[in-house]
C-alpha cells in the first residue's frame, strides 16, 4: 500500500468512525459523511489518473454530483428537524412520531 492510499483509506475510516461513535448532532453526522465522500472523490480521481482510461474519467464527477445532492438533502432535513423539534440532536428524533 502506497502512502497516498494509506492516507485516503485512513481518512475514510476516520470519517466512518466519527459517524459511528459521535452521533449526537445531525450536523456532525453530515460532516462525517462529507469527509468520507471527499476522501472517496480524491481517491477515485487519483485512481482514474493512474489508469489513464477514458471510461473511468467521468466517475469522479459523477461521485461529486451525488455528494452535492446528498449534502443538500442532508441540510434540508437538518433545517426541517430543527424547525419541528427545536434542535438537531439525533437522540430526540423518533421515526414513529414524525
Swiss-Prot record:
Q: What does this protein do?
A: Core subunit of the mitochondrial membrane respiratory chain NADH dehydrogenase (Complex I) which catalyzes electron transfer from NADH through the respiratory chain, using ubiquinone as an electron acceptor. Part of the enzyme membrane arm which is embedded in the lipid bilayer and involved in proton translocation.
Q: Which GO terms describe its cellular component?
A: mitochondrial membrane; respiratory chain complex I
Disulfide pairings: none
Question: Which InterPro entries does the entry mention?
Answer: NADH_UbQ_OxRdtase_chain4L/K, NUOK/Mnh_C1-like
Report the subcellular localization: Mitochondrion membrane
User: Major place of localization?
Assistant: mitochondrion
Q: Which Gene3D superfamilies match?
A: 1.10.287.3510
The record ties this protein, via Pfam families, to: Oxidored_q2
Recorded source organism is Tetraodon nigroviridis (Spotted green pufferfish)
Asked if the record carries the keyword GTP-binding, the reply is no
Domain of life the protein comes from: Eukaryota
- GO MF annotations, alphabetized: NADH dehydrogenase (ubiquinone) activity
GO biological process terms held by the UniProt record: ATP synthesis coupled electron transport
Q: Which reaction does it catalyse?
A: a ubiquinone + NADH + 5 H(+)(in) = a ubiquinol + NAD(+) + 4 H(+)(out)
The Enzyme Commission number assigned here is 7.1.1.2
Q: Which UniProt keywords apply?
A: Electron transport, Membrane, Mitochondrion, NAD, Respiratory chain, Translocase, Transmembrane, Transmembrane helix, Transport, Ubiquinone
Q: Mark the transmembrane ranges.
A: 1-21, 26-46, 59-79
Quick check: keyword Transcription in the entry? no
**What name does UniProt use for this protein?**
NADH-ubiquinone oxidoreductase chain 4L
By sequence similarity, the record places it as follows: Belongs to the complex I subunit 4L family.
Q: How does it sit in the membrane?
A: Multi-pass membrane protein
Q: Which PANTHER family match?
A: NADH-UBIQUINONE OXIDOREDUCTASE CHAIN 4L, NADH-UBIQUINONE OXIDOREDUCTASE SUBUNIT ND4L
Amino acid at each position: 500500500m502506497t502512502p497516498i492510499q494509506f492516507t485516503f483509506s485512513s481518512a475514510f475510516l476516520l470519517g466512518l468512525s466519527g459517524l459511528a461513535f459521535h452521533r449526537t448532532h445531525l450536523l456532525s453526522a453530515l460532516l462525517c459523511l462529507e469527509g468520507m465522500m471527499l476522501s472517496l472523490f480524491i481517491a477515485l480521481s487519483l485512481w482514474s489518473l493512474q489508469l489513464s482510461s477514458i471510461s473511468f474519467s467521468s466517475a469522479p464527477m459523477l461521485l461529486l454530483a451525488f455528494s452535492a445532492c446528498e449534502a443538500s438533502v442532508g441540510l434540508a432535513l437538518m433545517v426541517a428537524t430543527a424547525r419541528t423539534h427545536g434542535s438537531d440532536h439525533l437522540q430526540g428524533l423518533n421515526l414513529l412520531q414524525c
